[in-house]
């Protein structure tokens, strides 16, 4: 940079105070001899002497220093928290960086650092702030992309009750508290500032809840789904309250906003149709063209500008457009893969950190002294916020209890509904820029948001039991619903025929319909990217073969036979072996399945005598699913066709072994579905422990089975009941051996007979714990028959 340009630069940046004072609020222009964004290096200062500029005074190096410093610091905080086992969200680490930088460089007497981090806005355009705002909007768009718009329907009235009460009651309490203060004392804060504080505390935006739950890896839990749904309810409620406030002040403005929203709704609908068209024209397994991704980003920022101009809080427009993008592969997942990590790692930290740097930290230090004397901004703010927070926690907690959510989860829900994060920070910054709150109130609210975002995840981590993350509040089993909602897992081509045979035996009908999701699991090897394909949305490219062509064609034929009573949806998941059980459980949870069907890890030759495969990876998968499943699970040991011929009229002889217990009840419920099939001959073999041999106990035991049998008498019912009194496991083994050739399929509960005389002594010889004591005996190579076995475990 030459001396002339350096002189102009310094005069413009450092010596134009008088010119600014003369011009007042009017703008003025000056012309640089040369426009330079980047420096000539550290040697410039040495060559030009006092007339030269340091490299950090140029806009581009300054921006690079800010980005690099904030990135390194927030990553350092994030790794430190993980090492310590403290579950602090990423955005909280970003805000913490801003607080540390402001305190550190504000007190240090190092001009270059002050100039870069504290006073950069005085001498250059707000490029870092603009990039941070860009990232904030993009983050809202991506949150919309990952959102399942049907989540509220799945949560039902629970989320509506919690969402409405957790916003309305704190809002009213905040207004009453302000009114009482206004009458009893002289306030240093304005009514508008109290309104902003009350609104900030009453809101629980979906994006903040989703961000918190995602960072804590509990986003798919039942209470996590309810919390997100409740967040959506508060978003809608806040929208209508805001529009109502505009209408009450100016009816014309309210009408304009209503028309603007209707126009935007039509626009979102058209975008949704366009996105579905993109998916339909993207071949199965192929990536979406980049041009569609760029169009999506452009539309997101246009939506932001539209909402900023005609509605309010522009990021909501980007979020609403994100909802129009079908979540999951192939389109939604690509948006996340391409933009989320880069945005969250590089650009979003600028928003979180620079927002905290804007706070007046010297004022905060001063106010700590005034707070002890019970007056001033800090006293008013920090005596107001906890009261509204307690009101919000209490209403959320009580509403959760009222909707029959367990006590511990109700407490966690109350904590989640009080979380504060990026939305609240963006909202108070917007209020400050529009002169609705002062810098002092902004500083106090910023500190509260930081402290809240630090303590909330710690409280959740302390209260939450991660081993129960797949547990559902409602019972998901076959006894609760007449409709079978089954998730069939296909690991190998051999599983296709066996699973179709089993589904055929369950006899889907108009009175007892079946909704079946078929999940083809393919193990990823090497460094390939996990992929999830919905075969309802994507079709193979003409001339190419699908990953799951055999699976698709086979189950399509099954659906054609049962077209009026069975609904089949097919999916393919390419993921690593160690994550397959997580994929199955999450998918079953999201689809509302009440039965997961898995294949046993061993396969036999057609005669059922020689083992040809013993897949220990599949066995590990089955064990993990049994431990974590959100619904009932069935493991199918397929040793020979359960239908003797391929003709539809061929009979299938099924034996249900019933001892008692929850697993046997679930097996009985599954057998009830099979009774509707005219080709199924069902026998209930009741093994009665000698402890039940007295008349009263036997009568109670019999009623447990007879209740199911007589509840729904069907024409042509071919089911029978056979009773045996058993003294020990040896007698049980003899009975089962005696009937081994009489049946094609045995159904038994996994924990059937455990702790009773029926299985005494048999447990010592058990080889496969996933089959239970009796199931292991039936599947043993020493069992004379080669009948297939279905082992059922009820949801725990």
From Swiss-Prot:
Sequence similarity: Belongs to the monovalent cation:proton antiporter 2 (CPA2) transporter (TC 2.A.37) family. CHX (TC 2.A.37.4) subfamily.
UniProt superkingdom: Eukaryota
Main function: May operate as a cation/H(+) antiporter.
Compartmental location: Membrane
Disulphide bridges: none
Alphabetical UniProt keywords: Antiport, Ion transport, Membrane, Potassium, Potassium transport, Transmembrane, Transmembrane helix, Transport
GO biological process: potassium ion transport; proton transmembrane transport
Molecular-function GO term, any one: antiporter activity
Protein's name in the database: Cation/H(+) antiporter 6B
Topology of this chain in the membrane: Multi-pass membrane protein
Pfam families: Na_H_Exchanger
Membrane-spanning residues: 54-74, 93-113, 131-151, 159-179, 194-213, 223-243, 259-279, 285-305, 310-330, 344-364, 382-402, 411-431, 444-464
Tissues in which the protein is found: Preferentially expressed in pollen.
GO CC terms: membrane
Primary localisation category: membrane
């Amino acid at each position: 940079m030459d001396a002339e340009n350096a002189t102009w630069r310094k005069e413009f940046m450092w010596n134009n105070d008088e010119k600014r004072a003369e011009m007042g609020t009017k703008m003025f222009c000056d012309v640089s001899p040369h426009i330079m964004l980047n420096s000539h290096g550290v040697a410039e200062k040495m060559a030009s002497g006092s007339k030269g500029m340091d490299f950090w005074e140029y806009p581009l190096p300054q921006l690079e220093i800010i980005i690099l410093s904030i990135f390194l610091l927030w990553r350092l905080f994030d790794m430190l928290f993980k090492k310590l086992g403290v579950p602090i969200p990423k955005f909280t680490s970003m805000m913490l960086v801003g607080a540390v930088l402001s305190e550190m460089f504000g007190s240090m007497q190092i001009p270059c650092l002050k100039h870069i981090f504290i006073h950069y806005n005085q001498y250059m355009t707000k490029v870092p702030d603009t990039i941070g705002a860009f990232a904030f909007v993009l983050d809202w768009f991506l949150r919309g992309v990952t959102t399942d718009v049907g989540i509220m329907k799945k949560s039902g009235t629970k989320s509506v009750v919690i969402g409405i009460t957790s916003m309305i009651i704190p809002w009213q309490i905040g207004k009453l508290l302000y009114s009482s203060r206004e009458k009893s004392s002289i306030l240093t804060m304005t009514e508008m500032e109290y309104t902003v504080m009350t609104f900030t505390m009453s809101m629980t935006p979906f994006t903040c809840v989703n961000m918190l739950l995602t960072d804590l890896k509990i986003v798919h839990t039942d209470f996590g789904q309810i919390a997100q749904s409740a967040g959506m309810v508060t978003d809608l409620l806040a929208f209508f309250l805001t529009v109502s406030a505009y209408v009450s002040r100016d009816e014309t403005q309210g009408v304009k906003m209503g028309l603007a929203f209707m126009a935007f709704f039509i626009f979102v609908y058209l975008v949704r149709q366009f996105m579905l068209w993109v998916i339909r024209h993207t071949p199965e397994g192929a990536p979406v063209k980049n041009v569609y991704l760029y169009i999506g980003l452009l539309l997101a920022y246009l939506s932001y500008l539209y909402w900023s101009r005609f509605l309010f809080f522009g990021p909501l427009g980007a979020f609403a457009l994100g909802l129009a993008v079908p979540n999951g592969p192939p389109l939604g997942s690509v948006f996340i893969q391409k933009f989320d990590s880069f945005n969250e790692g590089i650009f979003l930290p600028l928003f979180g950190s620079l927002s905290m740097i804007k706070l007046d930290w010297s004022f905060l230090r001063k106010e700590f002294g005034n707070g002890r004397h019970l007056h001033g901004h800090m006293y008013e703010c920090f005596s107001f916020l906890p009261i509204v927070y307690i009101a919000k926690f209490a209403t959320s907690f009580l509403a959760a209890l009222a909707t029959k959510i367990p006590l511990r989860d109700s407490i966690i829900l109350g904590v989640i509904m009080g979380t504060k994060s990026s939305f609240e920070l963006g909202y108070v910054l917007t209020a400050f820029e529009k002169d609705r709150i002062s810098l002092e109130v902004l500083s106090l609210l910023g500190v509260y948001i930081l402290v809240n975002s630090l303590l909330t995840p710690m409280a959740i981590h302390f209260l939450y039991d991660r081993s129960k993350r797949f547990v559902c509040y409602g019972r998901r089993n076959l006894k609760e619903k007449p409709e079978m909602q089954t998730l069939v897992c296909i690991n190998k081509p051999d599983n296709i025929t066996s699973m179709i045979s089993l589904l055929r035996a369950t006899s889907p009908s108009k009175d007892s319909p079946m909704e079946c999701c078929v999940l083809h699991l393919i193990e990823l090897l090497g460094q390939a990217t996990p992929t999830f394909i919905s075969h309802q949305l994507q079709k193979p490219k003409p001339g190419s073969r699908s990953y799951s062509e055999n699976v698709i064609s086979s189950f399509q034929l099954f659906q054609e036979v049962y077209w009026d009573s069975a609904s089949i949806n097919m999916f393919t998941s390419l993921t690593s072996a160690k994550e397959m059980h997580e994929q199955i459980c999450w998918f079953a949870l999201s689809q509302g399945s009440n039965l997961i069907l898995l294949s046993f890890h061993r396969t036999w030759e057609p005669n059922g005598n020689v083992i040809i495969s013993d897949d220990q990876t599949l066995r590990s998968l089955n064990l993990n699913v049994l431990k974590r499943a959100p619904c009932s699970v069935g493991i199918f040991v397929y040793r020979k066709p359960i239908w003797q011929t391929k003709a539809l009229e061929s009979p299938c002889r099924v034996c249900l072994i019933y001892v008692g217990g929850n697993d046997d009840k679930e097996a009985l419920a599954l057998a009830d579905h099979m009774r509707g099939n005219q080709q199924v001959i069902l026998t209930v073999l009741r093994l009665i422990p000698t402890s039940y041999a007295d008349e009263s106990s036997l009568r109670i035991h019999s009623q447990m089975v007879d209740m199911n049998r007589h509840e729904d008498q069907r024409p042509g019912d071919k089911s029978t009941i056979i009773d045996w009194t058993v003294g020990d496991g040896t007698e049980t083994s003899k009975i089962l051996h005696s009937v081994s050739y009489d049946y094609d399929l045995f159904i038994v509960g996994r924990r059937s007979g455990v702790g009773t005389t029926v299985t005494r002594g048999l447990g010592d010889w058990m080889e496969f714990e996933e089959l239970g004591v009796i199931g292991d005996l039936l599947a043993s190579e020493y069992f004379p028959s080669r009948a297939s076995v279905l082992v059922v475990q009820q949801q725990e």
